[in-house]
């Protein structure tokens, strides 16, 4: 039971990271009706920006961990948000009214551009980082010596996810931008007729999704202690799977799907072969979609004619 509890903690932490990335996928799909296949690479860019910012701050002699974290979060969110804005302007906006495959192909092309750009700029090797947040708490020690531990970095990941979810929920439900986003989700043409700046709203959707992906990249960097140019592809596919599993277009579903994928991966790695953890996650997705085509929290679309 102690081993199970430890894996439950690990799975929830990993799922929190997937959930933050998945929100970006579901936001864009909910408002634009398209999948941003470059979003995983935006997550990777956020991780690299966090790493570079951290190294620059350390080189100046700054040692206060809270100050370093705050600066890294703000810088990585700001720069990565700019990447999100650029992707929308370059890869999506010119093709928004083209045939449906055009924006998808453009996004895939942008994904390759970002991946290879990062490989050239940062190299193909994994970039490690020394532990920034250490220590933790012992929750329980069994008679056979197994210890249930909750590390400080796990606490930071979970608290950061909860805070960002609360802020984002407030933004969507209580602000003018959130109202515009919900209006565009319902009907872009009608929203434009009612005075909503549709182009600006869609751009802000990409910006917010990229900022959340930047935080996820930072959490990944702190949790695993490394980044590499290929991590965006793997994490992006899993986060997209999480968004579909939870119900693409549903924000709570994106987080629920992220937690589900994180738990499936962690428990499979703990009790079975780690080599097949991805197979297990995608198999669960297939089973869920067979019986629930819209995902766990997705709503069926009804088109009136």
Predicted regions and their residues:
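Membrane-interfacial amphipathic/re-entrant helices at transmembrane-helix boundaries
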Residues: 1-22, 49, 61-72, 98-102, ...
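Helix-loop-helix "hairpin" substructures at the membrane interface of multi-pass membrane proteins
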Residues: 14, 146-228, 251-256
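Membrane-embedded helix boundary and interhelical linker motif in transport proteins
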Residues: 31-86, 90, 147, 247
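Alpha-helical transmembrane segments within multi-pass membrane transporters and channels
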Residues: 60-110, 117, 256-261, 292
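Transmembrane helix-bundle core of multi-pass membrane transporters
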Residues: 95, 103-174, 201-204, 267-272, ...
């Amino acid at each position: 039971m102690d081993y199970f509890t430890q894996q439950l903690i690990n799975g929830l932490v990993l799922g929190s990271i997937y959930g933050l990335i998945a929100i970006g996928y579901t936001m864009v799909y909910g408002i634009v009706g398209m999948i941003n296949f470059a979003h995983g690479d935006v997550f990777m860019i956020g991780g690299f920006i966090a790493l570079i910012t951290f190294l620059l701050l350390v080189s100046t002699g700054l040692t206060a961990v809270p100050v370093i974290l705050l600066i890294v979060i703000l810088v990585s969110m700001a720069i990565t948000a700019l990447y999100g804005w650029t992707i929308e302007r370059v890869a999506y906006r010119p093709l928004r009214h083209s045939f449906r495959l055009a924006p998808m192909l453009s996004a895939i092309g942008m994904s390759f551009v970002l991946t290879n750009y990062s490989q050239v700029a940062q190299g193909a090797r994994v970039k490690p980082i020394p532990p920034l947040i250490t220590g933790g708490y012992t929750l329980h020690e069994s008679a056979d010596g197994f210890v249930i531990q909750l590390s400080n970095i796990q606490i930071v990941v979970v608290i950061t996810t909860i805070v960002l979810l609360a802020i984002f929920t407030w933004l969507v439900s209580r602000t003018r931008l959130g109202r515009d986003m919900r209006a565009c989700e319902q009907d872009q043409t009608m929203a434009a007729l009612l005075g909503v700046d549709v182009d600006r709203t869609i751009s802000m959707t990409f910006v917010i999704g990229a900022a959340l992906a930047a935080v996820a990249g930072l959490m990944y960097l702190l949790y695993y202690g490394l980044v590499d140019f290929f991590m965006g592809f793997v994490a992006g596919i899993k986060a997209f799977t999480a968004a579909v599993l939870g119900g693409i277009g549903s924000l709570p579903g994106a987080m629920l799907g992220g937690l589900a994928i994180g738990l499936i991966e962690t428990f499979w790695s703990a009790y079975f072969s780690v080599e097949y953890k991805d197979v297990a996650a995608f198999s669960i997705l297939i089973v869920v979609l067979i019986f629930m085509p819209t995902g766990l929290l997705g709503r069926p679309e009804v088109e009136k004619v």
